[in-house]
Amino acid sequence: MSAEVKIEWDILRKEKPPVSIPLPLSRPDDEQQPAPNSKARVALITPPYDRISPGYEFVKDVTNQAPSLGLLHLAAEIRLHGYQPYIIESDIFNLSVDDVVEQVLREKPKYVGITLFTVGVWNAATISRQIKAASPETIIIVGGPHISSMAGETMQRFRDFDIAVVGEGEEVLALLLNNLDAGGDLESVPGIVYMDGDEVLTNPSLPINRDLDHLPMPAWDLLPDFPKAYPAAVYDFPRLPVATIAASRGCPFHCKFCDTSTFGAQVRAYSPERVFELIQHLQANYGVRHILFVDDLFLASKPRTKKLCELIIESGTKITWSCTARVDTVKPEILSLMKQAGCWEISFGLESGSNEILKSMDKAADIARSEQAIKWTSAAGIRTKGLFILGYPGETEQTIQITKNFVRSLPIQIMNLTKFTPYPGSPIYRELYGTNIRDDHWRKMNGMNFLWAPEGMTVDELDQHYQDVLLSFYRRPRMMWYYTRLTLRYPAHLVRLLRFLLHFAMAKTRSLLAGRSGLLLQEQDQVHLDFED
């Protein structure tokens, strides 16, 4: 019998008395031995994201195609409880909405789980509607960042979503599936949102899981052709194959543009020993040679990072890896140890060259710290990547020029420039939109579209500045020579780049003949579907 706790209800527009809900289900003693697969099949899906114009899907030849770690964790957890999960990665395998629906109807799972990023909500809704039309008994469960930040609004808008799992979903999904199979009442399942007629009901959440070591190993074995079919972005790795690991969850900072707080600000981490075990597993079973750590804040704990590095060094493990960091979390001592342990690249969220913009973002950092962090990292022999945002509220012609000059002054090897996007769940979203939810903007929220322009500027002007900042960084002789050497040193980059350029030339010719000109999704490419409430 599981323990029970009393938790007050938090229900939109409806109050209920306190009730007893179960704590997480007990798991088998040996997490590597799943329970017998005697229960239902469960499809876990990432829907197609409308980022690229039709005919230009090959752009994925050079972009990051990492599998969804969230789905891998969910699959591993429910498999422990006897369910039979399988994963459909739409974007990675160029699957359309119709392709996904066809696969689901062919496999006939009892449950369909769809992860929702804002850009994919409309396609997820279309998939759900078509599945429901052909198989009304199939239960659609949604989760992910978007639903965790806008559960009520999304469930009211798209009625083919049966149940939403809010926040980290491993234990909640296992509880939910077991409850549904037993014919239980949804009121007894924590961490979910669902509709009762026109009323949105929100069940209380489970306590945050602090012990990530308790989670089973991600179900990499369910991925077809892993890791070959899931490469990192070109020039973003020194060798193949590549795999991703999240060594921790959560971020204690509160940058206004970021939606990470949707899953909580409290940092929870695997032990260094468990992370090392994951690395060894990927090496031994899949031949992985480079790890991308995708933590919100990899260097949240220097002692933990130090211990992991020592485990790698002392064992003689030959692995290279990349991670992200804030500029105020690095020091020469830890950087030197990271380099010895195989750290190849650190990505820093620098965001802007203007202290004024950084302050308005609540970034809790400044230009001087950024310059020092990049200097220390470069001195340690670790490659540096700068992550920037253009078009944030308060941006002006002057701040853009300051950022442009700042980017060029840094000894960074790669620069990612994102078009400011006010994601649901971020503090800035509510500031800009208030309660006026623009769901017609959701399908464009991919960092490739300016949906909003600061006062005194237009979207067209922002697009011009965006191109100018990018080209001013990459068209310099120093950068062109660097990428030439990198291409010659790592032939895997050359093969993918040549394949991309060939496909691009062919597609560009076709598009010009057809009177089209865009690589990124254009307004005329989008299909706006009318969903009945």
Question: For each predicted feature, which ranges?
Answer:
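Glycine-rich beta-alpha loop elements in corrinoid/cobalamin-binding modules
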Residues: 70-211, 425
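Proline-aspartate-enriched helix->loop->beta-strand connector
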Residues: 108-112, 288, 412
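Radical SAM [4Fe-4S] cluster-binding motif and immediate context
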Residues: 218-387, 392, 401-405
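Structural recognition of alpha->loop->beta junctions
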Residues: 153-171, 340-345, 402-417
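Radical SAM enzyme core and accessory elements
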Residues: 1-44, 80, 101, 110, ...
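Flexible glycine/acidic-rich beta-alpha junction loops that bind and position SAM and/or redox cofactors
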Residues: 51-54, 151, 197, 302-303, ...
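Short, electropositive alpha-helical surface patch
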Residues: 99-100, 104, 309-312, 396-411
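N-terminal [4Fe-4S]-dependent radical SAM core
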Residues: 5-38, 48-59, 189, 195-247
